[in-house]
Amino acid sequence: RFAWQHKLEPFDYWYAAEAASFSSLRDRAIAYGAFGGTPRYLAAIDSGSTLAENIQRLLLAKDGEVRALLETALDQEDGLRDTAKYRTILRAVAGGATERNEIANRSGLTNDRGLRDKLDTLIELGYLERRDNVDAQPNDAVRYAIADPALRFHQRFVEPNRSLLERQSAAQLWDAKVE
């Protein structure tokens, strides 16, 4: 029986930039900021389209392939229950809450062991990362951040503009909010 499991890590910037196949260094950097290093997201990029067209089609459009993958990622995690709370935590962190107390206040969740366990789970799954200062003391507050660039882009531009995306095209949102 095959029981070995290995978590596939996303590409770093160098390999993701090669996979994105844009010629300008600026476009490669922006592509990494929008799509991250997840090979599945990078594979959806159409090399015959501009960076703006790819972001609009894959991340901003209602039926965008990468957008759909990001929006359903938590639902596909084995053994993860009550995904609404995890989404609320991600939304709070993306909105600027970086410490556990801030996350609890912004998300409406209780700052207890349950929240800490959820934060640890999101770190283990690769959605969040823990950031400590170089000179942090053991009792200093831990800071959290969205770990994946594609999820960060989604939380920054798609989530807060859902109603706008229902009324306008992805190109209009791109022009008004992203570019």
Segments and roles (model prediction):
Residues R1, A19, A43-I45:
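Short, conserved acidic/polar surface loops in the N-terminal third of protein domains
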Residues L25-A44, A97:
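The conserved phosphate-sensing helix
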Residues A17, Y32, E102-N105:
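The alpha-helix within a helix-turn-helix
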Residues Y41, I45-E179:
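Accessory nucleic acid-recognition modules appended to NTPase machines
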Residues R1, P10, T38, P149:
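A short beta-strand-to-loop transition that corresponds to the Sensor-1 phosphate-sensing loop
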